[in-house]
Amino acid sequence: EKTFLTVSGQLEGEIYAMALSEVYTFGPTFRAENSNTSRHLAEFWMVEPEMAFYDLDDNMDLAEKFIQYLVSQVMENCADDMAFFNQRIDTTLLETLRNIVDNQFERLTYTEAIHQLQKSTKVFNYPVEWGFALQAEHERYLSEEVFKKPIIVFNYPEQIKSFYMKLNECGETVRAMDVLLPNLGEIIGGSQREENYEVLIKRMQDKELNPEEYSWYLDLRKFGSAP
């Protein structure tokens, strides 16, 4: 029997969320990516919360509070280390961390982000066009040069996102969000889940997935569900 390295515990986490309302997983994650960059890892540990009856706004609120809590704890409990890094590695580190903790994250739709990029005079290596994923240079431009603080981009085109993400009424976007930090880029990705059984099956078929292979997941929607 074939076995695979896990990329996420999310789908399984949804099972427990149906019973316990608020749960999280913390475990190893493997990605078939080139890890010879400052932004990619082939293996890392990831926290994945799953909450029943959370909409996209609730997800964005949780993501913002989570990042701010973690950064504040690092600044409080690892002050000497942060001071060392600020002195020897990046003299703007402490300023960047305070900016994360002290400011409300900017929120804008994917469409608004595309408009911001298209009206910019900056020349990007990758073209800016609605329907394509934002590249690292786009994300950093928005967080570092336009807003100069953490941002949350939401309502992405459905064709570039996963089948389980809640489809908006327009039918063109899904209730997904990414948290982008200055000097780093994307640090959190999340979404409101699609709770409609028929819509979920169609989304699977549109992405050429076999619903029978996800029968256990579809049962969560067939016999009562929550977003």
PLM regions and their residue ranges:
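A translation/RNA-centric and nucleic-acid-associated enzymatic feature enriched
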Residues: K2-Y69, A83-P227
